[in-house]
């Protein structure tokens, strides 16, 4: 067994004392530009259709008051997170989205920019959001406190949700991977292999779902300040 179960998440790849783990975050940028000067294949056509569908959905979520071009930011956010989630499933590639360093870096500036824009440009609208419609006057002070707290913890919940989902799946696969070499029965090895494949398929689905959830929630937070 491993001495430390969480050691799989340690950024330990270095050359000349330069950490190379976080470079995997930008590997997707090497794949995307080829679509601009090469004939599109079936995969690229499918990917373009996915991006177009996301663009239409995010545009609907932003509403008529959303700024033109805003969907590009959220589609790019979805692509970046999904690429890194999938790269983390490959052996010996650093899972950058399992660290709050990356997820908070994505969530906090987005939330802060939305808040600054909303409170500076739509102050009355932001104050109105603190008290839901139909709230009794007696409960208004409590609702203001509750809404303020729920608003402040949004970047934290976004970041922790993504990080926790990535860590949970990788820990399960690590535990199964370390159990296999100690087993001498072919039946147990076969069961572990089948379970590992099923977990890998499940983690692939989680990689897509979590990137979609992160992008959609960011879009919804943006639509509230318009």
Swiss-Prot record:
CDD domains (UniProt xref): ATP-synt_Fo_a_6
Subcellular location(s) of the protein: Mitochondrion inner membrane
Keyword Transcription regulation (UniProt): no
Gene3D superfamilies from the UniProt entry: ATP synthase, F0 complex, subunit A (1.20.120.220)
Topology in the lipid bilayer: Multi-pass membrane protein
A matching Pfam family: ATP-synt_A
Transmembrane domains' residue ranges: 18-38, 74-94, 100-120, 162-182, 187-207
Subunit structure: F-type ATPases have 2 components, CF(1) - the catalytic core - and CF(0) - the membrane proton channel. CF(1) has five subunits: alpha(3), beta(3), gamma(1), delta(1), epsilon(1). CF(0) has three main subunits: a, b and c.
Role of this protein: Mitochondrial membrane ATP synthase (F(1)F(0) ATP synthase or Complex V) produces ATP from ADP in the presence of a proton gradient across the membrane which is generated by electron transport complexes of the respiratory chain. F-type ATPases consist of two structural domains, F(1) - containing the extramembraneous catalytic core and F(0) - containing the membrane proton channel, linked together by a central stalk and a peripheral stalk. During catalysis, ATP synthesis in the catalytic domain of F(1) is coupled via a rotary mechanism of the central stalk subunits to proton translocation.
Protein name per its UniProtKB record: ATP synthase subunit a
Species this protein is from: Aedes aegypti (Yellowfever mosquito)
